[in-house]
Design a protein with these regions (language model features):
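Bacterial N-terminal signal peptides that target proteins for export
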Residues: 1-9
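Bacterial N-terminal signal peptides
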Residues: 8-18
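Sec/Tat signal peptide C-region and signal peptidase I cleavage site
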Residues: 18-24
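Secondary-structure end/capping motifs
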Residues: 233-323
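Conserved C-terminal helix/tail region of periplasmic/extracytoplasmic solute-binding proteins
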Residues: 309-353
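Short, glycine-/small- and polar/acidic-enriched structural segments
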Residues: 25-174, 185-195, 211-213, 219
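Pocket-lining segment of extracytoplasmic ligand-binding domains
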Residues: 169-170, 175-274
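Solvent-exposed, polar/charged alpha-helical surfaces in well-ordered, non-transmembrane soluble domains
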Residues: 42, 46, 83, 87, ...
Length: 353
């Protein structure tokens, strides 16, 4: 009898613990994505609102269930996203190609997705009396130093045959610089900023105009999702990358479809400085989305990105944004490069698996 009871208890115990490995297998790994308010990056906040994903830890949307990962969204201002990524406080972050280089020196990084490129979204705005770039030699030009603002300014000077040393680019937060110009504060006759500050300044102060902008350097400022190699190497790291990419393209389908376009733009606008649909239509003209897998693959597998990165790296080294020349790699081969452009995740999402 005791033997029968012992066997019974043993059987019950084995039945109970047999479920533990199954539960462990079902535990979904959590990966974090840091994002800030910007047209193409706000897509992830909108995806949460649309319930395509659930940005809360421990909650899953259909795309997360599809790929078997839990995407935790961490919204912060842009500078904080850069710091968080460099400090390993997130697995991936929405960063530009330029701003991915410095953290990549300490944390090998992979560009998994291009989201957009500036096509007028970064601009030098001046008062009506300034009509020629040479007039800026006598003025301070305010903008955020060592960012895409200074890059836009310097590259346009180069294209116009001007010397950077002849001009005064003065470090200032773009929001503060835009506000000072809008309020007609003395000395603020030229600023370099990005949207929404560009549109806000032009709308609020009618005696200003764009002297030059990022349309002259098409494709050089690339907005991306950058992921750490150490996160990719974790179990389900590739699935997380694919889930992020899948999410972005699903939102773009809503932006592109006539029946859902306006609502999607309004949702983006609410996540991006509370702009209305008409303003957002202008914004997405000036911020060209890489809205399909084919568009993303064309960039990541083409020669243009290599030429662009040569220019960006040179600028970053010359302006001491990076302490040394970062190694840039292309393709799916694992490396310890500061930044590697890898198309394999887009390819996987495009294939539907």
């Amino acid at each position: 009898m005791k033997k029968i009871l012992a066997l019974s208890f043993t059987g019950l115990w084995m039945l109970a613990v047999s479920g533990i490995p199954a539960l462990a297998k079902e535990k979904i790994p959590v990966f974090t994505l840091a994002w800030s308010e910007y047209p193409s990056w706000s897509a992830f906040g909108v995806a949460h609102e649309y319930r395509l994903i659930d940005g809360r830890r421990g909650k899953l949307g259909p795309i997360e269930k599809k790929w078997g990962v839990d995407i935790e969204l961490k919204e912060a201002d842009y500078d904080t996203c850069i710091v968080m990524y460099g400090a390993k406080q997130c697995d991936a972050a929405c960063l530009t190609n330029m701003d991915s280089l410095a953290p990549g020196l300490a944390r090998a990084s992979v560009a998994i997705l291009p989201t957009s490129t500036s096509d007028g979204a970064d601009a030098c705005i001046v008062t009506k009396d300034i009509t020629d770039v040479k007039q800026l030699k006598e003025a301070k030009v305010f903008g955020l130093a060592k960012t895409v603002s200074e890059y836009t300014f310097v590259r346009n000077l180069e294209l116009l045959g001007e010397k950077e040393a002849d001009y005064q680019f003065t470090n200032m937060d773009p929001g503060a610089a835009a506000l000072a110009m809008q309020q007609k504060q003395p000395g603020f006759n030229a600023i370099v900023a990005w949207n929404p500050f560009v549109l806000e300044t032009l709308n609020k102060r009618k005696d200003t105009h764009v002297l030059f902008d990022s349309t002259s350097i098409k494709g050089e400022i690339i907005d991306m999702v950058t992921m750490a190699q150490d996160a990719l190497d974790r179990p389900k790291g590739m699935a997380f990358a694919c889930a992020v990419i899948d999410t972005f393209y699903e939102i773009n389908k809503k932006i592109e479809h006539p029946d859902t376009r306006d609502d999607a733009l309004v949702a983006l606008g609410e996540k991006f400085s509370h702009l209305n649909v008409e303003s957002m239509k202008k914004v997405v003209q000036q911020t060209k989305f890489y809205s399909t897998p084919d568009a993303g693959l064309a960039l990541f597998t083409g020669n243009e990105v290599r030429t662009t990165m040569d220019k960006v790296v040179k600028f970053c080294v010359d302006h001491e944004i990076v302490v040394k020349d970062p190694e840039i790699a292309y393709g799916s081969e694992h490396s310890n490069a500061a930044l590697r452009f890898d198309p394999q995740f887009i390819i996987k999402v495009k294939a539907g698996n």
